């Protein structure tokens, strides 16, 4: 996981930033390189999730399950010319890659994700649940367990929007696309 982080310099600034986070005042945008393309080029995923602190995992569950919290994200497919990630082969376009001993072919697709909620491992769990696990995610993609082909998970917090905690000026930070 890579990307942009925000740190507060003072306790008052931290309090304001936390308040913005809780009231959905933060625009949190991620890029993920996933195996397989979602059935729709853009969409909203809304599920209930529960965290298992013992195993440091989360899973989708029913709304009635003890500890269940709503999890909502929006995704959009990124065109090849706007990619942040290079594909596994180093190409800037989608490629087919073999992920398992059965040589199951998967198609890499880059998604832009906007979080409405920020649950533990939310993006990883929800994308895996629709058959689009993140490249390099050995926790939620059993096809990759023990596979060392990718060194890191291809998930990046690439854009943040929020109001400055003192001046209330709109702040916008964004990583540039991979020039390769």
Regions found by a protein language model. Name each.
Residues 1-180:
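RNA pseudouridine synthases
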């Amino acid at each position: 996981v890579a990307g942009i982080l925000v740190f507060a310099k003072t306790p008052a600034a931290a309090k304001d930033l936390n308040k913005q986070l809780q009231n959905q005042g933060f625009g949190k945008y991620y890029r993920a390189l996933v195996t397989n393309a979602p059935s729709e080029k853009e969409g909203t995923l809304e599920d209930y999730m529960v965290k298992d602190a013992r195993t440091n995992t989360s899973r989708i569950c029913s709304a009635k399950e003890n500890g269940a919290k709503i999890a909502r994200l929006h995704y959009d497919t990124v065109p090849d010319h706007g990619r942040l990630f290079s594909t596994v082969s180093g190409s800037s376009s989608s490629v087919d890659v073999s992920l398992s001993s059965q040589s199951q072919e998967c198609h890499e697709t880059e998604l832009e994700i906007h979080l409405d909620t920020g649950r533990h491992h939310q993006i990883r769990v929800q994308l895996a649940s629709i058959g689009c696990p993140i490249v390099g995610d050995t926790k939620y993609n059993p096809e990759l367990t023990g596979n060392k082909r990718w060194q890191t998970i291809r998930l990046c917090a690439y854009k943040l929007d929020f109001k400055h905690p003192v001046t209330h000026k709109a702040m916008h930070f964004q990583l540039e696309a991979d020039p390769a």
